Amino acid sequence: MKHIPNIITCIRILLIPVFCYYLWNDCAIAAGIVFIAASLSDILDGYLSRKLNAVSNFGKLADPFADKVMQISAIILLVLLGRMSAWIMIVMFIKDFILIAGGLLIKFIYKITVTSRWFGKISAFYLNAVLAAGILFSLNKNIIDILMIIAVVMQIITLIGYTTLSLK
């Protein structure tokens, strides 16, 4: 039972190329279903790992890895398909780099592991909702860009929140 959350995370990782195939081949419904299923499985494996007392070092690394790779894949493909502006992708990558580098610095310098907070979960949910909408619906590129700008602002606020909490 304690391995179930990690199995779900591994399945989510295996869904990434399936998602990419469907989105690249203009199967928006299938790509959207896979993306949403992966997003929901993230909620499920987090819940189960806490409920079953099955938090593991593997899960601590693999879970955020699966989330980021799925999100990055969606963003890259939406840009390549002309549904999102490239500058949004660049800003998101810079933000992710700062988040990862900052998290590693805090971990190694201050010996603190940053854990997920409510504001991080809200901004991640919003980002996934915007990406799902961009995948499933033929939204105007400008609309997706505006929604992604809101996601970027939320992510930056989240980054500031995590930094502030970590340095207290």
Q: What would you call each of these model-derived segments?
A:
Residues 1-168:
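Alpha-helical transmembrane bundles and membrane-interface segments of multipass inner-membrane proteins
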